[in-house]
Amino acid sequence: DANMSDDIFADLMLPEPHFHLGVGGGTHAEQVGKVMMAYEDICLNIERPDLLIVVGDVNSTAACAQVAAKLHIKVAHIEAGLRSGDRLMPEEINRLVTDAICDYLWTPSPDADENLKNEGHPDSRIIRVGNIMMDSYELLSAKIDDEHAPAKYGLENEDYGVVTLHRPSNVDDPEILKTIMDGLVENSQKIKLIFAVHPRTRKSLEQYNL
């Protein structure tokens, strides 16, 4: 979603990217294939990096890592070693594939280190760098405070929770989404919730009349 992407760059005070792959929605295979072709073109014809750093567990993470590995470009993975144990999740497959071909496994936590060791990754490739989500929060905490978001919702003197949903496995199936929404409604009786609705989630909520 272009609008959401622009908002994220602005909120995090990030510069415009030098390259935009221009890959939108589609099936997992379509996304991975299009990303691989677009990124390979950059590496071969525009700018070949000395090191590719990929983040997280999305399709572009695994796709770009595969391109780099096949072009003999070193790859580092931020958030390496995170596991859900559920191979029905597309993100879990992306994690496993990416970590299997990376040269540097940059982990957020001790459990991630152990997951990688249990999978046979050598200690020399595992480097704990910490949780980048917490880094982001620390860098932006003053900006967050300046937004006075609790006051906007009348919550400055109350406990509250913030909710967002975006994983396809949670929002694309009407039964699963209804179960989650019922749980949120129930919990909202105990604590007020602010629901930051992702475009994909909004579409499903409207489609399923939830």
What are these regions (language model features)?
Residues 6-8, 14, 145-210:
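Donor-nucleotide binding loops and adjacent catalytic segments primarily
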Residues 87-91, 139-140, 207-208:
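Short secondary-structure transition/capping segments
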Residues 59, 82, 133, 168-169, ...:
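Short, glycine/serine-rich, charged loops/turns that create anion-binding
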Residues 1, 81, 111, 199-200:
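Residues in the short beta-alpha loop(s) of Rossmann-like NAD(P)-binding domains
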Residues 2-3, 22, 101-176:
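A nucleotide-sugar donor-handling region in carbohydrate enzymes
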Residues 8, 20-122:
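Active-site and donor-binding regions of nucleotide-sugar-utilizing enzymes
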Residues 74, 125, 192-193:
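Residues at the starts of beta-strands that form the adenosine-phosphate
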